[in-house]
């Protein structure tokens, strides 16, 4: 089962639909009392988009700290920003607010989430906060940037299976979004098969 942590965002149920086509999925709010127990039982965690700054989003950052390296983690928009903060990066306000705007994204290095995708592709962006490129994020590769404003759009810690996307794969405006979610789910399923063989 993949657990989606809902950061009180309208896009969360798009994510639930995408993941639910591929595997068992559960969803719980970021401040729900059952969150810790649900996360323990899950095979992987997806942190949804949401409003505001990640430090204000319930138990999200605590959960990332707790389960990093134990379960695959995918952070989307606010979830991406939480990963950045938890692992020592910095956030800043974007030079240009992106609410419902398409951008072309260019891959800068390999990323499991982008398997079977072209080197450039269109994504949908809804955010006013970005990762500060001036502050290093140890153990993470920057795997995609926006071609229009140069902002960081994706990060990956391959060893720990932690992936962050600043854009919205669950939006209809991200044409290859379902492929990205499928790539993550496939990784989760491979982990389960490997552990069953041990």
UniProtKB/Swiss-Prot annotation:
The lineage's top-level taxon is: Bacteria
First-level EC class: lyase
Q: Which InterPro entries match?
A: Anth_synth/Amidotransfase (IPR050472), Class_I_gatase-like (IPR029062), GATASE (IPR017926), TrpG/PapA_dom (IPR006221)
Q: What is a GO molecular function of this protein?
A: anthranilate synthase activity
Q: Which residues cross the membrane?
A: none
**Entry's PROSITE patterns?**
GATASE_TYPE_1
Which CDD domains does the annotation name?
GATase1_Anthranilate_Synthase (cd01743)
Q: Which GO terms describe its cellular component?
A: cytosol
User: What is catalysed by this protein?
Assistant: chorismate + L-glutamine = anthranilate + pyruvate + L-glutamate + H(+)
Q: Can you tell me which residues bind L-glutamine?
A: 50-52, 81, 128-129
Note whether Endoplasmic reticulum occurs among the keywords: no
Give the GO biological process terms.
L-tryptophan biosynthetic process
Identify the EC number(s).
4.1.3.27
Where do the catalytic residues lie? 77 (nucleophile), 168 (for gatase activity), 170 (for gatase activity)
Q: Where is the Glutamine amidotransferase type-1 domain positioned along the sequence?
A: 1-194
Q: Does the keyword Calcium apply?
A: no
**Which keywords annotate this record?**
Amino-acid biosynthesis, Aromatic amino acid biosynthesis, Glutamine amidotransferase, Lyase, Tryptophan biosynthesis
Pfam families for the chain = GATase (PF00117)
Could you tell me which pathway this protein works in? Amino-acid biosynthesis; L-tryptophan biosynthesis; L-tryptophan from chorismate: step 1/5
Extract the signal peptide range. none
Cited function: Part of a heterotetrameric complex that catalyzes the two-step biosynthesis of anthranilate, an intermediate in the biosynthesis of L-tryptophan. In the first step, the glutamine-binding beta subunit (TrpG) of anthranilate synthase (AS) provides the glutamine amidotransferase activity which generates ammonia as a substrate that, along with chorismate, is used in the second step, catalyzed by the large alpha subunit of AS (TrpE) to produce anthranilate. In the absence of TrpG, TrpE can synthesize anthranilate directly from chorismate and high concentrations of ammonia.
Per UniProt, subunit arrangement is: Heterotetramer consisting of two non-identical subunits: a beta subunit (TrpG) and a large alpha subunit (TrpE).
What is the protein's name according to its record? Anthranilate synthase component 2
Native source species = Lactococcus lactis subsp. lactis (strain IL1403)
């Amino acid at each position: 089962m993949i657990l989606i942590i809902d950061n009180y965002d309208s896009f969360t149920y798009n994510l639930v639909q995408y993941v639910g086509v591929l595997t068992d999925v559960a969803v719980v709010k970021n401040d729900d009392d059952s969150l810790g127990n649900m996360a323990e039982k899950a095979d992987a965690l997806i942190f949804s988009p949401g409003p505001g700054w990640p430090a204000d989003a319930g138990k999200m950052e605590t959960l990332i700290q707790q389960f990093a390296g134990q379960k695959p983690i995918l952070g989307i928009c606010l979830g991406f920003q939480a990963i950045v903060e938890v692992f020592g990066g910095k956030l800043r306000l974007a030079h240009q607010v992106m609410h419902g705007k398409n951008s072309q994204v260019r891959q800068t290095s390999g990323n499991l989430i982008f398997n079977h995708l072209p080197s450039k592709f269109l994504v949908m962006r809804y955010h006013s906060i970005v990762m500060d490129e001036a502050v290093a994020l140890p153990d993470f590769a920057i795997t995609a940037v926006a071609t229009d404003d140069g902002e960081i759009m994706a990060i990956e810690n391959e060893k720990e299976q932690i992936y962050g996307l600043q854009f919205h794969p669950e939006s209809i405006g991200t044409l290859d979004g379902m492929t990205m979610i499928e790539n993550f789910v496939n990784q989760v399923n491979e982990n389960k098969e490997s552990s069953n063989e041990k």
